[in-house]
Amino acid sequence: MVNIVNQDDGSGGTADRKNREYGGIVRGNLVLESPMGKVGNPKKDLDVYITHRDIRYGDITFHSHPSGQIIERPDNAGGTIIGGVTKTFQWVRAPSIDDINKASGTDYEFSRGDGIVYIYNRSGVQATIPQKRFITPKK
């Protein structure tokens, strides 16, 4: 699970790998990677998503929410700026209402932007844990 979602290293930015979802299915002792989601833009897109194929009864699904972000600072091309507003556009960290409504049982969402793992079902978020305490990835 962790090795799949860690394709987004959690450092934010505009690279494609940081602006798409990764995930898969846990079936017994197997972890099956789902096709990565399409690249999104946190300034323009409401969300990004991943599609898990062939979900069976008893499967556990997991996916990431991207760390990508766009930071817009005031333009200082003409000289010194006093005041101004910096805007940050980023992806939602916690499971969305859609994630919760589509839960097939107990599912996992890895928030790559803040390193939190959300454990949730159709009733909502049941627990959170820092990813660094969840499991140590292969090196």
Task: Map each language-model feature to its residues.
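Glycine-rich short-loop/terminal segments
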Residues: 1-58, 123-124, 129-138
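Active-site-proximal loop/helix of nucleotide/amide-processing enzymes and allied scaffolds
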Residues: 44-139
